[in-house]
C-alpha cells in the first residue's frame, strides 16, 4: 500500500518524433554515449522513486527490451505502459497511471523522455518544493530567448500560475511571453486523476493536453506552483537533429569541464569529445581531435591524442596513445601506441609495450615490454614478454576457411618481413631471419631462416631491358669501375 510520502515518476516516450526524420525512435537517438531515454532514466534512478514507469507508443517493440536492459544495469524495476493510439500527453499520463498501484497516493512526477540533460538534483528539488508547499501541481519553468514551439506560462498580476497555453493555441500577445513550460511536473496524484477525467480535445491538435490540467485544478481552487530553472539546458527538449546536436555539444562541454576541474588537461575542449561513462585519471593530457567513447578508462599521467578515437579501451597509468583508432582493447601502464595504430577488439598490450606506426592488432595478447615498432599486422596471436617483432611482419591467421592462432614466446627477435603462418609456435629466445616464412614451429633459442642462397644473374638488365634507364645506369657504373659489362665475353 502506498503512502503520501511515496514518489512515482512517469516518463512520456510515446510520441513518434516525426520531426527527427528518422527510422530510429526519437528517444533512442544518442548524445554523450547514451540514448536520450537512457540519460533520463539514469538521472531519475538517482532520485530513487518508489515507482518508475515509461509510457511507450510508437516503436514500443524496439524500446521496451532496452528499458529492461537499463533496469538491470540500474538494479531497479522500470515498468512500461502502452499508449496504443496517440491522443496527446494527457492521455499518455492516463495510460501511465495504469502502471502504478490503484491506491497510489504519493507525489507523481511526469517528464518527457526527450530531455536528456535533466539531472537528479533538479528532479529532487522539484519534489522537495512541491511537498513543502502542498500544491496540487508544481510545474518547472524556464526562460528562453526564443520560446517558439514551447507552451507559455500564464500568470496573474500577483505572479500566480493560471494556465499553460500551447504554442499552437497561443494568441500573438501570449507568444511574446518568454517563460515556458519545461514539461516536468510534480502532481498530487488524486488531484491529477480527477482533472484527467475532465480533459477535452477542443484545441488545435485535437488532443488531450496534460497542460490543460493546470487550468482545471486552478478552477477547483487548488494551489498551483511553479519552480523556475535558470539553467535552461537542463530542461531543454529535442524535436529535431539541430536541437540534438546543440544539446550534444552542451553536454560535451559540461563533461569536458568536469574532467578539467578534476585535474585533466584538455588542450582544446572544442575538438575533444568525451562520453558520460568515460573515466580519466589526474594529470593526463588530452590533445586536440580526441574522442573518448563508450566506457573508455584512461589512467593518470597519460598522453592521449592528437587525432585519437578510443571506444571501450582501457589505458594504464603513464601510457601514451597518439593518432590511434582503438576499440575493445587494453593498453598497459607505461606503454606507447602510435602514431597511426589500429587496435581492434581483443587487443591486450602489456605494461611498457609498444605498438608503433602503422601497426594493426586484433584479438592479440602482447606481453610486458614487447615491441611491435612498425608496419605490422598482429592478428589472433599471443606474444610473450620483451620480444621484438621486425618491421613489415604479418601474422597470417586465415587459411581461407577459419582463423588460427600464432604463439611467440618471450625474448624473441624476429627479422623484418617475417610471415607467421598459423598455427605455429616460436619458442622463447628464438630468432628469425629477414624475409622468413615460418610454417613450422621454431624451437627455443633457434634461428629460423626459410630463404635459400641468393643467386645473382649477371647482365640480366642489359639483355632483358636494353636501352632502359636501369641499363644505362648499370653500364655507366661498370665503366666507372673499369670493368667489362656483366655477361659480355672477353
Curated annotation (Swiss-Prot):
Region spans: Linker: 242-262
Active site: 374 (proton acceptor)
Pyrophosphorylase as annotated region, ranges: 1-241
Biased composition (Low complexity): 467-490
Pathway: Nucleotide-sugar biosynthesis; UDP-N-acetyl-alpha-D-glucosamine biosynthesis; N-acetyl-alpha-D-glucosamine 1-phosphate from alpha-D-glucosamine 6-phosphate (route II): step 2/2; Nucleotide-sugar biosynthesis; UDP-N-acetyl-alpha-D-glucosamine biosynthesis; UDP-N-acetyl-alpha-D-glucosamine from N-acetyl-alpha-D-glucosamine 1-phosphate: step 1/1; Bacterial outer membrane biogenesis; LPS lipid A biosynthesis
Annotated keywords: Acyltransferase, Cell shape, Cell wall biogenesis/degradation, Cytoplasm, Magnesium, Metal-binding, Multifunctional enzyme, Nucleotidyltransferase, Peptidoglycan synthesis, Repeat, Transferase
NCBIfam families: glmU, PRK14352.1
Function, as annotated: Catalyzes the last two sequential reactions in the de novo biosynthetic pathway for UDP-N-acetylglucosamine (UDP-GlcNAc). The C-terminal domain catalyzes the transfer of acetyl group from acetyl coenzyme A to glucosamine-1-phosphate (GlcN-1-P) to produce N-acetylglucosamine-1-phosphate (GlcNAc-1-P), which is converted into UDP-GlcNAc by the transfer of uridine 5-monophosphate (from uridine 5-triphosphate), a reaction catalyzed by the N-terminal domain.
Name of the protein in question: Bifunctional protein GlmU
Organism name: Mycobacterium avium (strain 104)
Gene of this entry: glmU
